């Protein structure tokens, strides 16, 4: 394949391997941003009467294994309709970002990733059943009776890294690793959320627009 230009729109940490000719300072900058490990879990339950009895929709649990438990947000598409009666089955959404408190954020993410990759499904299931029982039992929830299915989605390289003033230097704008890392190299430009040091769609669109324009003449 031949082209007049190329946009590398992948994870920052992969780019030095795809283009080893980059300057060392740029490769170092591309390796700086460490993605946040995440676990998003869906739990199918027979009904959500326990939530109704307790008068809750979401529970935040700082310090617990799962940091948040909530009823899935209602989505109506085509002929599909979200459950409206507490007697109907529904999905719960559980989230976790494994970390190691006390360390710099980037090191916490690395340790959290290792934990995530070495955790068995049996451990996730046990933690789910235990926390849901402690959270919802006062509303009549019984994990042995009410849990129908569990799906664990592990993202070892989850959200893009965002600078944290507790751990990262207060760089001038042009010296931030994401800015150094996205510099054009010949006919190669770089676009991804890492280039904006964030994790969201609007940033990806903005960075794609910038990278394409860097390739255009004039």
Q: Model-derived features: where do they sit?
A:
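Glycine-rich loop(s) and the adjacent beta-strand/alpha-helix scaffold that form part
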Residues: 1-62
